[in-house]
Amino acid sequence: MQPARKTWAGGQTTNVLTRRGRKKSVYIPEHFRSEDQGATLAFMRANPFAILVSTKDSEPFASHIPVVIREQGGRIKLRGHVAKANPHWRYLAEQSPCLLIFHGPHAYISPSNYETRENVPTWNYGAVHAYGEARTFSEIPELLNMLDDLIPTFEAAYAQQWSALNESYRTRMLGHIVGFEIVVSRLEAKFKLSQNRTRQEQQNVIESLSRSSDTTVSGTAELMCEHALGTKAQKKSKDQ
């Protein structure tokens, strides 16, 4: 089940999706590049458990964190928090440029799905890289505001329980976290979903993956269908 989407007023959001010919920091063949920012944001919202990456003394440092994607004032903002014991918040405060990686379903693709024997295995997946500047905060009012975003997104039913907790307990718990907000300056979206294969081969892949009991694998088939791949999508397009 996808987390509930929360929307905010603020007018049209600036398109920060990296387009053809622009500088990029991840290898994306043109077959697999997305130039649809709306679809990219939807993918991020459906897969909000991201990897936050920044540097300390030229060494990479990563944390695995759920985040909320917010569109406000024409900008995309990513909000979340880390444990105060996690030094990552200090690294963000010292050097604000950072990267958040959103990864969705993925699956091994057997060459048995293809129409000729001269083929090799590959892997299908979707991923989005979000680059931006981070700001950290630990003031109670702003932490509460951040949780007002997180709780409705991931478990709206918990809001009442959270509000009913003893205030001293809530304050003590908030003292163990540091919040962050990242204003996104650039998005790079890669959906490697057999776009370089024939429609029939795409359909073979979809049907093969759909038979799996592993939701990560079958989810890859669903992602391919969302991107209008396969013979069924082609037929639907012709019928419209």
Model-derived regions: residue spans:
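Cationic, low-complexity basic patches in intrinsically disordered or flexible, solvent-exposed regions
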Residues: 3
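Binding-site signature for planar aromatic cofactors or substrates
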Residues: 11-240
